[in-house]
Amino acid sequence: MSLGIDCLPQRILCALALLVANGTAAATELPDCSRPLSLALHEHGLLYSRQTGGGIDKDFADELIRRSGCRINVTVMPRARIWQLIESGGLDFSLSGIANEQRQLFAAFAWYFSNKYYLLVRRDAGVQKVEDFVRNPQLRLGAIRSFRYSPSANRLVDALDADLRVSHSTGLAPLYATLLANQIQGMIVEPFDYPALESATIREQTAILEFDDPAVPHGLIMSKRALPLQEQAKWRALVDSMRADGTVDRIFDKYFKPELSRAMTRF
């Protein structure tokens, strides 16, 4: 699905807009736009919604396009497919990604927010703490295919997966449905999922447990195979400029209360 987003003004106008936004002619050197670039979003709560066509990542992508002056084809696809294409070099960018040892072999990152992860459990599962979920072999966890989380959440998913106690899905909506149907008894959630968690049906039937982990940095994902080191540095500088001038704060303020927004964007 192509969203048909590109920088409509001429490149020089985009460059001038970037200089004005940063208030100085010594702004970051612009990335190479000699070829069309590609960026994939994934549907996930407040990050992006097919239904509304908007979200945090969509806003972030729009601003990257505006500042860089590059033609970037934006599509929507499952997260697992995104990582495959980033690794092969078939995709230049994605957003809101987290790093691990394996991913760092083929992807570079430019951080712009961080958040914590939580375990959402059915109230009738008898789970008071995360360890209770592990100890009960009758309980199953739902997870989005290829997603990684905080260290403790990753250990939980990996341990249960080894015991064949994880049901994988391509997105959040199927997980909520299987949770309400009691086909799974828990799933990993984060702040972008809050609107769904506030629905009466889910709120009445679930409880939230916190993992004892610090917030995990998320950022622009850059394919090392597609983008040379010099270009990665230019895109990272663009992201840093968005953080420095308050643009990232303003994007998150559209979706979260100020206290939570600042906790996520100032790390």
Indicate residue ranges for each PLM-predicted region.
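Short loop->beta-strand "edge-of-pocket" segments that line small-molecule binding or catalytic clefts
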Residues: C33-R50, E131-Y149
